[in-house]
Amino acid sequence: MPQPGSSVDFSNLLNPQNNTAIPAEVSNATASATMASGASLLPPMVKGARPAAEEARQDLPRPYKCPLCERAFHRLEHQTRHIRTHTGEKPHACQFPGCSKRFSRSDELTRHSRIHNNPNSRRGNKAQHLAAAAAAAAANQDGSAMANNAGSMMPPPSKPITRSAPVSQVGSPDISPPHSFSNYANHMRSNLSPYSRTSERASSGMDINLLATAASQVERDESFGFRSGQRSHHMYGPRHGSRGLPSLSAYAISHSMSRSHSHEDEDSYASHRVKRSRPNSPNSTAPSSPTFSHDSLSPTPDHTPLATPAHSPRLKPLSPSELHLPSIRHLSLHHTPALAPMEPQAEGPNYYNPNQPHVGPSISDIMSRPEGAQRKLPIPQVPKVAVQDMLNPSGFTSVSSSTANSVAGGDLAERF
């Protein structure tokens, strides 16, 4: 009977071993699964362990309940994210230029941003191309809309500038604003619009021949509308013959401005034609009486030029003192560049003081001398002028002037 006893004893021994072997086998299986996780078997273990974790979390309280449905959540951010599924809110917008996608979850935005940040992704390249094309199309639409708005808004401001002479932003004659010549040409084209309609349709630049023809024709027809016979002969004839284009442009502005003034303004010119403004004032503070500048024929009520008694063309219009000032001074009635391309060449180099006689031999005479010792420039002779003559307004500084009170004294008394 040893076999049955041994068998019974063996079976008794196996029963408790079988009962205790079940958790041991489970622990061994868990240990083997843990060891196998190091051998790239981690996803099956996680999938197998996820239900256990979810079962463990099922026991936790869910205080955050959705007000729109029966779902409850452990954390507040989970409830907020769930509510966005009902409302359709997408607060997370893609910051990539040209991309207009929005997401309700931050992790979706992070996943989407990898498409733009990964240059090797085909989808990312396609999305970038589409985004760039959309951005370019939007920019083109905005540019065309701005161009249309600018084109529709450009003609109205030019009309009051052409027809009348308001208190505008025209600079003073001693300051040349740094505008381009295209603005100068457009302004001139608008001033000559009644006489040269074809130049108004040009996109850029100006036909000088057309301007000269139109201005010369108007000069012949209406030259006696501003001055008497002798005065118009002095102002129009010799100055147009010697100066050319600046006088034509000045006449064009004067004619366009004079249409907005009555005959009373033209008659009052005879009494106020010597009136000047203070030297340092950028704009005129006097009433809008037609005061004439240095080399223009237009009444300019918006500003008056600097006081230049020695260079006044009305005092001695035929004397060489007309060439004292550069031609930019009389081209600054409107927006002119610092050096206008339409500036004609001067008649002579005597810009300094034409009253001084030429003393000493010329350079050609010095260079033609045979001896080398005689080929030397003479010492320049400085004219001896007394201090009283320099300080006196009617002295050396205003040789050709016939009025001494036209700088800042007498004109202020007349003005007030």
From Swiss-Prot:
Region called Disordered, residue ranges: 1-21, 145-179, 220-321, 340-368, 395-416
Lineage of origin: Eukaryota, Fungi, Dikarya, Ascomycota, Pezizomycotina
Superkingdom classification of source: Eukaryota
GO cellular component: cytoplasm; nucleus
InterPro entries, A to Z: creA/MIG_C2H2-ZnF, Znf_C2H2_sf, Znf_C2H2_type
Reported function: Transcription regulator component of the regulatory network controlling carbon source utilization through ubiquitination and deubiquitination involving creA, creB, creC, creD and acrB. Represses the transcription of the alcR, alcA and aldA genes by binding to a GC-rich region in their promoter. Also plays a role in response to carbon starvation and the control of extracellular proteases activity.
Any one Pfam family match given in the protein's UniProt record, by short name: zf-C2H2
Family note: Belongs to the creA/MIG C2H2-type zinc-finger protein family.
Bias kind Basic residues: ranges: 230-242
GO process annotations (BP): chromatin remodeling; negative regulation of DNA-templated transcription; pentose-phosphate shunt, oxidative branch; regulation of carbon utilization
Name assigned to this protein: DNA-binding protein creA
GO molecular function, one term: RNA polymerase II cis-regulatory region sequence-specific DNA binding
UniProt main location, coarse: nucleus
Record text on subunit structure and interactions: Interacts with creB.
Organism encoding this protein: Emericella nidulans (strain FGSC A4 / ATCC 38163 / CBS 112.46 / NRRL 194 / M139) (Aspergillus nidulans)
PROSITE patterns according to UniProt: ZINC_FINGER_C2H2_1, ZINC_FINGER_C2H2_2
Keyword DNA-binding: yes
